[in-house]
Structure formats: structure tokens, C-alpha cells
Amino acid sequence: MGRAPCCEKVGIKRGRWTAEEDQILSNYIQSNGEGSWRSLPKNAGLKRCGKSCRLRWINYLRSDLKRGNITPEEEELVVKLHSTLGNRWSLIAGHLPGRTDNEIKNYWNSHLSRKLHNFIRKPSISQDVSAVIMTNASSAPPPPQAKRRLGRTSRSAMKPKIHRTKTRKTKKTSAPPEPNADVAGADKEALMVESSGAEAELGRPCDYYGDDCNKNLMSINGDNGVLTFDDDIIDLLLDESDPGHLYTNTTCGGDGELHNIRDSEGARGFSDTWNQGNLDCLLQSCPSVESFLNYDHQVNDASTDEFIDWDCVWQEGSDNNLWHEKENPDSMVSWLLDGDDEATIGNSNCENFGEPLDHDDESALVAWLLS
């Protein structure tokens, strides 16, 4: 494909032209004209390429060529034409008679482009140059427009370009809520009330280290008419005259005497007034064991046995403490089996309740349990 070569490359002479070749080319063109540059070398008898013959004739052998250096007037005209026409050297050479396009191009690249900033414009010549440019521009044919390739247009060319400014969204920082002093104070008071109520419900255990039972003044539920730690619940069972009534507000003196105050509402029964808190008070307070056993013989009630504080009975006797007698395990078992011997069981004050046992007592108890 492509353009056909101007001549056959076989046997073509290359290099500088000789004077004989210049003379043959000049004589042939003067007699026959330029004609076709492809057939000219063959017709003239030259072993040269047609392009080489054309360039040799146009640039060197023509009779109308202007020899010598380019004048300042020509330089100014070249500058003006170049500013309007650009690098169209053939059009610029058409406005300069006797100058070729190749000569003007070489002179521009080697001289004018370097000293363009030092070039001085003369008013007399500028008027002539402007007139020449206007006449030549009107007579010159319009330049051919570049052909545009047919095809689909891109989406970027079809869509209108709209520049949108992006607005930054500012995050709203919520300030931390101020603490409400009233609410905090109310919550604190509520917690204090709850804690005090819990402590009131738990209560204090009886003091087993010599203090009198009258010192325990805290009630279980904090209500009037309900059994408290001061109440001697065992006295409810020790009343021989009327065992069916209940006695509240019963206190025990320091010498073991019982002072009972009859309650008018005491005949209601154990199921109505007895609760778990009163049972704990019964087990914690240590009444007279002898009086309790006497009442047990008089009143055979099945519910009485569950209120006996057997820990107090085990730990203390009438005169001698069973845990400190250092007897054999058989004697301890015999004492436990002889429950009718009331003489061996005396009044107890629970002074040693909760105290750790001696090493001998612990070993004796373990031996009895393992036997």
C-alpha cells in the first residue's frame, strides 16, 4: 500500500551533484520544461531520483533565484507573515520573490527565532508589510479544513459540564447533658432509705456475752404489736394457768425471774402471729430450760418441740458445762438419751453460745459421730 516510488532505486546515484549533472538538467528544463519529475531523470539521461532533480532545480539552478543574504526588510516581512500564517513556509516564500521555502525555513530556525526579542520594528516598512499581508491574505485560497472522523460522540462531549460545589456537612456535636442535682439527690436518699430498711429487717443478734436481754430493743418489722427481740417467747409456753393465750411484751430479768404482761389479743393462735422472724428470735434468745421442760410435761403440744433451742441445752447444764466435763462419748450419749432428767439441765444464759470448742471437745465429738 501507500504511494508508489518515484523511480527505481536500482542504479541510482547518490551524493553531491556535479557540474556536468547541473548542466544536463538545466539544458533539458530550458528546452522541454519541467514536466513530470518522475520521467524527467530517465528522459534527460540522469541517474538521479526525480525528487533530487526537483530540489536541485528549485533551490539552486533556477534563473530567478535571489542570491545572497536575507535583508532586514525581508526579515521583518518573514516575522510578520510567520505571526499570521505560522510554519507555512511555501506561502511565506510566495510573498518573497527569489526566495525558496527551504531557504526561509532554514534562516528562521537558525537566526530569526533566536534574535526575535531584539528585533526592531521600523514604521516605514511596517505599513508596506501590512498592505502586502492584507492583499495576499484576500487573494490566497482558504486553507483546507481537517476532515473529522465520523463516529459516535463520547458521553463526555454530549453531557453538559456543570461544576457543582460540594458543601461539607458539619456534624452537630451535642453538648453533654448537665447533671441534675435534684434527681441525683433524690436517688441518693432513696438508696439510703432502702439500705436502712434492709438493716432494720436484718436486725441484730442477741448478745451472748453477759449483756441483759433488755438491751436488744430493735424490733423485727418495726411495727407496734409485733414480737420483738425483747419478747420472751418461751414465756408464752410457760404460763400454767392459761396455755392457750399468747404473751407479748415479756421480759426476762437479770435473776431469771419472768415478768409476763398478758396481751388481750393473744388468743389468736400461733399460725396468725408466728412468723419466721419471731422463730429466729425464739432460737436466739435463751430462756430458762427448766421452766420450759416443766411446761413441756404440762402441755403436750406437738408444736412445742420445734421451738426448743437444743444448742443451748447441749452447750450448758445446771452447774457444769457439758462441753467442759471431758467425759467419754458414752456418757454424753447417755445424757442425751435421758431427756427426763431435769435436774441435770438448769437455767442457761447462753453466755458461751457461738464460741469455738476446745481441741479435746472437738475430738470427743468427732469420735462420737464416727462411732
From Swiss-Prot:
Promotes flavonoid biosynthesis when expressed in tobacco (Nicotiana tabacum) and tomato (Solanum lycopersicum) through up-regulation of the biosynthetic genes. Tobacco plants exhibit increased insect (Spodoptera litura and Helicoverpa armigera) resistance due to enhanced accumulation of rutin. One of its GO terms (biological process) is positive regulation of flavonol biosynthetic process. Keywords: Activator, DNA-binding, Flavonoid biosynthesis, Nucleus, Repeat, Transcription, Transcription regulation. One of its GO terms (molecular function) is DNA-binding transcription factor activity. SMART domains: SANT. SUPFAM superfamilies: Homeodomain-like (SSF46689). This is Transcription factor MYB12. Flavonol-specific transcription activator involved in the regulation of several genes of flavonoid biosynthesis. Activates the expression of CHS, CHI, F3H and FLS1. Controls flavonol biosynthesis mainly in the root. Confers tolerance to UV-B. Residues 9-61, 62-116 form the HTH myb-type domain. Residues 146-172 have a biased composition (Basic residues). It comes from Arabidopsis thaliana. GO terms for cellular component: nucleus. Residues 136-183 are annotated as: Disordered. Induction: By nitrogen deficiency, sucrose and UV LIGHT. Triggered by HY5 in response to light and UV-B. Disruption phenotype: Reduced flavonols levels in roots. The double mutant myb12 myb111 and triple mutant myb11 myb12 myb111 accumulate less flavonols in roots, leaves, stems, inflorescence, and siliques. The double mutant myb11 myb12 is specifically altered in flavonols content of siliques and roots. The triple mutant myb11 myb12 myb111 is impaired in flavonols biosynthesis and exhibits a reduced UV-B tolerance.
